[in-house]
């Protein structure tokens, strides 16, 4: 059985060699990227089970990310497998400003009182912490007395005890001992801040990614609050001639949860970004929302990626904790299409081991989906011919113990709909366009491949059998299910045929 749950692996310096030096060694960042050595490390991740690589534009400039993308193309050649390319936007965010005296951080103790400035363009001091807010917003009027300001992923909490309208500053009191570092993330739960739908930097980053050789296949849009946030990115993709790029809305706050249905409808999929979500909403609700989101996205037949802190301890340790293993396992049982590695593979000590561990857990968990899974295919929409065929394919595969479904698909939609039903079989998606092929890398159970478009219906079924045999997924004498649209090029799926491989 092949691994059907996909892995999104974030790339960063952990797998990159510069001037013969590894990340963490003295002088590393002063050296040029060694493309060949780095590509071999990335190829190793592909061999261990990475299906999609994530380029996190919260870190690194365009030259760095462009070189990283080019290195992945070389890694594909070494590994002999293609992967998907996912650009993750920085998104609208707040961070602490630099300190006026050049300090990296200041220490505070419980009960310390000081101020937080909402005016933009200031520098921090021990008495006044300045904020850098996306879009240059002044958030003074958006935050109420009694709310909590969280710094550095919630490591430090500040109670907002007063507001000074004359200076537009917050009066705050430290809830615990901690430090305030420069350029650390700031969250204010239960607050609706009127960020622009798309920050200027995100617009530039997206256009840069789309312009790279080979382009990108997925965009993860950070801090999506409404469907309009997704539509803004869709507009850029269409404007630049990239309507095929799939958009994953990152659900990270209460507003995103409240508007979940409209966001799912507007996007091609959802990324459950549990890091910021765990700060923006009550932490005990994170697993509840994870199950809710996965269930809704499964029903819609779209992509769902579970992300953040999945194997966090492997950033520093060669083995995951038992709770982390359970976390990955349960995400698969919940119905996720893919699980994601962040710091573990981007800047951790054990990127290859992290991918291997996640692949092992994913593969084990998928064998128990039928017994423990939370899918309810009987509730899925069956109002179209393609939906009915997709449901029938799953039933036929299970009734006849068929291990391979071959879907000939121009847009990828047929394979996605079959994947939605989680059949106990691999789904070999035969496409005729590399963009479609790469766009299927993230879907559960789908093994995409590309070939020449058949010229007739008879040729179509012959091609399906030939490609299936060449893939090594079946042998002569095995039964396969072939799903396609007849006649060729109709753009709709209306035919299911069970065929014995010659």
Swiss-Prot record:
Binding site residues for K(+): 56, 58, 88-89
Pathway(s) the chain acts in: Carbohydrate degradation; glycolysis; pyruvate from D-glyceraldehyde 3-phosphate: step 5/5
Binding of Mg(2+), residues: 252, 276
Alphabetized UniProt keyword annotations: Allosteric enzyme, ATP-binding, Glycolysis, Kinase, Magnesium, Metal-binding, Nucleotide-binding, Potassium, Pyruvate, Transferase
Required cofactor(s): Mg(2+); K(+)
Name by which UniProt lists this protein: Pyruvate kinase
Gene: pyk
Organism: Lactococcus lactis subsp. lactis (strain IL1403) (Streptococcus lactis)
EC number: 2.7.1.40
């Amino acid at each position: 059985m092949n691994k059907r749950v996909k892995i999104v692996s974030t790339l960063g310096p952990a797998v990159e060699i510069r001037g013969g030096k590894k990340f963490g060694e003295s002088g590393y960042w002063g050296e040029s990227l060694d493309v060949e050595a780095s590509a071999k490390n990335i190829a190793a991740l592909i061999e261990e089970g990475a299906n999609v690589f994530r380029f996190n534009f919260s870190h690194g400039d365009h030259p760095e990310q462009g070189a990283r993308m080019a290195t992945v193309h070389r890694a594909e050649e070494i590994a002999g497998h293609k992967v998907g390319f996912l650009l993750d936007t920085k998104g609208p965010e707040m961070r602490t400003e630099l300190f006026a005296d050049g300090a990296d951080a200041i220490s505070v103790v419980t009960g310390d009182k000081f101020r937080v400035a909402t005016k933009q363009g200031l520098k921090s001091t021990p008495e006044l912490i300045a904020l850098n807010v996306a879009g240059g917003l002044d958030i003074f009027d958006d935050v109420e007395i009694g709310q909590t300001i969280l710094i550095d992923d919630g490591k430090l909490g500040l109670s907002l005890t007063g507001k000074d309208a004359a200076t537009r500053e917050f009066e705050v009191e430290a809830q615990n001992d901690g430090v305030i570092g420069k350029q650390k993330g700031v969250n204010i739960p239960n607050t609706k801040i009127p960020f622009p739908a798309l920050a200027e930097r995100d617009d530039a980053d997206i256009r840069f990614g789309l312009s790279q050789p080979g382009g990108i296949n997925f965009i993860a849009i950070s801090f999506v609050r409404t469907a309009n946030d997704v539509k803004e990115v869709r507009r850029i993709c269409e404007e630049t001639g990239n309507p095929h790029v799939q958009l994953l809305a990152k659900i990270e706050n209460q507003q995103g949860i409240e508007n979940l249905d409209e966001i799912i409808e507007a996007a091609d999929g959802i990324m459950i970004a549990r890091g910021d979500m765990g700060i923006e909403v009550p932490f005990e609700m994170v697993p509840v929302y994870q199950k809710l989101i996965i269930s809704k996205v499964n029903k819609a037949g779209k992509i769902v990626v579970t992300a953040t802190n999945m194997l966090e301890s492997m950033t520093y340790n060669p083995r995951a904790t038992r709770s982390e293993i359970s976390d990955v396992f349960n995400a698969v049982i919940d119905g996720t299409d893919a699980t994601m590695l962040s710091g573990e593979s981007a800047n951790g000590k054990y990127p290859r081991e992290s991918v291997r561990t996640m692949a092992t857990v994913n593969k084990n968990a998928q064998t128990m989906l039928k017994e423990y899974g939370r899918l309810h295919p009987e509730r899925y929409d069956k109002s179209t011919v393609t939906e009915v065929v997709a449901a029938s394919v799953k039933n036929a595969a299970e009734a006849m113990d068929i291990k391979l479904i071959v879907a000939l698909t121009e847009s990828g939609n047929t394979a996605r709909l079959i994947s939605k039903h989680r059949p106990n079989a691999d789904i070999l998606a035969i496409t005729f366009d590399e963009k479609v092929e790469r766009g299927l890398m993230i879907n559960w159970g789908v093994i995409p491949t590309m070939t020449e478009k058949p010229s007739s219906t008879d040729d179509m079924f012959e091609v399906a059998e030939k490609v299936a045999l060449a893939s090594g997924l079946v042998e002569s004498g095995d039964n396969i299910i072939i799903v396609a649209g007849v006649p060729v090029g109709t753009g709709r799926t209306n035919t299911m045929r069970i065929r014995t491989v010659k």
